[in-house]
Amino acid sequence: MFSRKDILVLGMMIFALFLGAGNIIFPPMEGYTAGQHWATAALGFVLTGVLMPFITLVVVSVLGRGEELTRDLPKWAEVLFLATLYLVIGSTFAMPRITNVAYEMAFVPLDIVADTSRNHLIFAVVFNIIAMLFMLKPNTIISSVGKFMTPALLVLLVVVTVTVFISPLSDIVAPSKSYADSSALTTGLISGYQTMDVLAAIAFGGIVARALSAKNITEPQKIMRYTISAGCISVVLLAALYFSLFYLGATSDQVAQGVSNGGQIFSRYVNVLFGKEGSWLMSGIIFLASLTTLVGVTSACAYYFAKFSNRLPYSFWVVVFTVMTTIISENGLTKLLQVTIPALLLIYPVAIMLVVLQFVRAKLPCVKLTYNATIAVTVCFSLCDSLNNVGLLSDGMKQFLGNFPLYDNGLAWLVPALAVMFLTMLVGKKRAV
């Protein structure tokens, strides 16, 4: 029997797994640039940064694991996608980024020790060892994250968000050019990509499925019902938080001059509101957010590679990813963010279309035809976006892509992918006849 308390704990765990430090960093900057359009921009951000990951989480939880999304692709394509997915959200990009965000926003502002490469390494080692201790006992993940870490994190965030609405630092600023010249909703939609939460949901769905299985809940209908119930808790909390952080950014003109990222806005804002105590408050928020996400992401990656390799156990991969994360994090946050974006532009649209295809799969007359054609088209367009980001796309290709709807909004792949999906459905029906 899954009680209301169990649903609450699971919902809090889902909230904590999705709420990484990066999710706290991005909204303030977007709110600052959106200015008077902050609410509309926040709505767009919530659609891609909260609602879409929630839908993905439910789908994957019912399937049992993220790998089921790719079962209709050729084996080589399935392995390539999943390996890329877990590398992006794992020890190559996201996990080292989490470590660096925790160091730069939770440790350095306290001025306990000097900001040196040696101290960075010491922090990275200690921080990742703490996370590893949680992961080596996977049965404690739902209880430790859902019962202890999340409530503490939530209390700290409530203190900040309530204070922001009661005592904003500045009047709401005018929108920047990027928000003034285009739809704030669309710009917010694209900004929501930065959370990488659709990718994370593919990994986290397996964690939720295992948590429910531990309670003897294995029937698809029950899994869906409890995942939706628990997930709604996460959706409400994340949406409320993002709207609050967008408002924080929109009213941050007093402290936002000369900043380069939302983390600096958040840090300065909190310090002005709460003084020296604000540094400790912010450090607590960032540290807990980073730790909970690191535990969830690394655990999901370790489970996947343990299944893929068969002979090497989960604990081995936890140690491997912990060591890799510690080493790669020494490259610094700025460099990691630069190399993450091209990979994200390539894989994110593919992940979205795999979820969309799952909804229509039962009605497809020729499953493999639709899957292969749709994903192939999506990859072609997303690859162009990735190459364009690193300056390797030719002017001719840019001009060609400019003819497609939503190109200026970074969504040139969407219409062709959907068109091919529906076209292959019609072709499949004719073949069946």
Locations of regions flagged by a protein language model:
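Hydrophobic, membrane-embedded alpha-helices of multi-pass small-molecule transporters
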Residues: 9-19, 127, 163-170, 179-245, ...
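Hydrophobic transmembrane alpha-helices that form the core helical bundles
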Residues: 29, 78-112, 287-307
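Selective recognition of specific alpha-helical transmembrane segments in multi-pass small-molecule
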Residues: 51, 55, 152-164, 198-200, ...
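Membrane-water interface regions at transmembrane-helix termini and the short interhelical loops
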Residues: 61-68, 128-149, 214-217, 327-339, ...
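TM-loop-TM module centered on a large, flexible mid-protein loop between adjacent transmembrane helices
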Residues: 67-73, 241-291, 342
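Hydrophobic alpha-helical segments and their helix-loop junctions in multi-pass secondary transporters
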Residues: 91-95, 154-180, 198-199, 247-250, ...
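Membrane-interface loop-to-helix entry segments
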Residues: 136-164, 340-352, 371-380
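A generic transmembrane alpha-helix motif of multi-pass inner-membrane proteins
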Residues: 167, 367-433
